[in-house]
A protein has these predicted regions:
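C-terminal target-recognition/interaction regions appended to catalytic cores
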Residues: 300-404
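Conserved nucleotide-cofactor-binding alpha/beta core module
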Residues: 79-182, 186-193
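Residues that form generic nucleotide/phosphate-binding pockets
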Residues: 15, 30, 253, 355, ...
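Class I SAM-dependent transferase core
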Residues: 1-95, 99-102, 106, 122, ...
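Short, ordered beta-strand-loop transition motifs
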Residues: 58-60, 199-200, 330-335
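Class I SAM-binding transferase module
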Residues: 165-311, 400-403
């Protein structure tokens, strides 16, 4: 079996390096050394070494709740984490145990990895898979990650592998001085993998990368959960910051589409998912997201802004009885770029569509601010300094100051 997987494993590492996701030799060596296929029993080795996320557990309604993350974003986050030999690392979200194994390789025999998951079955499976892969130095614990794991603190590095709505105080409190916390932070529905450094009285971002993860469950669960729309299985709306919305009215509006507007603005998929999505989230409190899964895609209610296998998603402005959603690409657009459109739904949908189009043009006119220049500072909720030049997002525990 070793000979069978060496080639596809090496090919994956080369692919990640060529794309810029792997940038250091120690991260490359971790991916070469750790056998992903042993953490995905039942998956063909060739599939295990594809640069794709693989769902490993679903809820009864079909929504995925655990997976082996896409290697590209795993590599990005490990580069952000900047793990050194001998360090103590806390991971929130064990999943299959593959990422914990990569971390164990990075810290070496003088370091230690503690990994937490809320599901007993996942922890037990991960323990077995770590043992089968010959990985030592990992303590896999069934616990709610919101509280961290005080027994192993302080940690030089903390990494969260599920989308976090807030920065939990326990993660910060268990982080060593000048330690680093990497987490997929949800900002009104847009996810960013943020590498924070712990300073005297706050966390300061050192790098930001767009990402997409399943949400944390348990005490730190995101109130921006997907809400089902109507009686169509697989149709959901993500509401920002627990915004009150008449879901039945939105479902009715989706059955009343209007004529699509064109913005004339050409974009790439990455720009839509991250840069434009973040601009809308920060500039309009009515921004939200529509998602269709499985058979709901065929109902053609959600404009196919971005499509993944088994899922279609778009960003929208949500009104009381109407909405407007970003739409595209059309079939004649080149694969790497398309002109974005705006589709109104329901009464007053045209007004929302014009407002949404204005945001697209404003983002374009501002030079399409990217995550490379994004700065995020996280303070305890009531301890942040006044800074009128920043966007301010308040969470239950944290005040985020955001600027480009």
């Amino acid at each position: 079996m070793g000979d069978d997987v060496t080639v596809p494993r090496g090919r994956l590492v080369d692919l990640l390096a060529e794309a810029g996701h792997v940038r250091t030799e120690r991260v490359a060596e971790a991916f070469r050394a750790v056998p992903r296929h042993l953490f995905l029993p039942g998956v063909e080795p060739a599939d295990a070494y594809a640069d794709e996320a693989i769902v490993t557990k679903r809820q009864s309604d079909g929504r995925p709740i655990s997976s082996s993350s896409q290697p590209a974003i795993m590599a990005e986050m490990l580069e952000q984490l900047d793990v050194e030999p001998g360090q103590r690392v806390l991971e929130i979200g064990t999943g299959t145990g593959y990422n914990a194994a990569l971390l164990a390789h990075l810290v070496g025999t003088t370091g230690a990895v503690t990994t937490l998951d809320i599901d007993t079955d996942l922890v037990e499976q991960a323990r077995g898979q770590l043992q089968a892969a010959g990985i030592t130095g990992v303590n896999a614990v069934c616990a709610d990650g919101a509280a961290g794991w005080p027994g192993g603190a302080p940690y030089d590095r903390v990494i969260v592998t599920a989308a976090a709505w807030d920065v939990e105080p326990a993660w910060v409190g268990q982080l060593a001085d000048r330690g680093r916390l990497v987490l997929p932070l949800s900002l009104r529905g847009v996810q960013l993998s943020v590498a924070f450094e712990a300073l005297d009285n706050h966390l300061a971002s050192r790098s930001v990368v767009g990402c997409g993860f399943m949400p944390l469950r348990g005490a730190a669960a995101d109130p921006d959960q997907a809400q089902p729309l109507g009686d169509q299985p697989g149709l959901f709306v993500h509401l920002a910051d627990d915004r009150p919305t008449d879901l039945s009215a939105l479902y009715a509006a989706l059955h009343q589409p209007g004529a699509q507007l064109t913005t004339g603005v050409a974009v790439t998929a990455g720009q839509v998912l991250v840069e434009l999505g973040l601009w809308l989230a920060l500039h309009d409190p009515d921004a939200g997201r529509l998602v269709a899964l499985g058979d709901a895609i065929d109902a053609d209610l959600v404009p196919a802004l971005i499509a993944f296998p088994g899922m279609t998603s778009t960003t929208a402005l949500l009104g009381a009885q109407a909405l407007a959603a970003l739409a595209g690409p059309d079939t004649t657009a080149p694969a790497d770029s398309f002109t974005i459109g705006v589709r109104p739904f329901g009464p007053d949908g045209t007004d929302l569509a014009q407002r949404l189009a204005a945001h697209v043009h404003a983002w374009d006119a501002a030079g399409r601010p990217s995550t490379a220049k994004l700065r995020i500072r996280a303070y305890p909720l009531h301890e942040a300094p006044a800074d009128p030049a920043t966007f301010v997002l308040d969470k239950p525990h944290t005040r985020l100051l955001i600027d480009w």
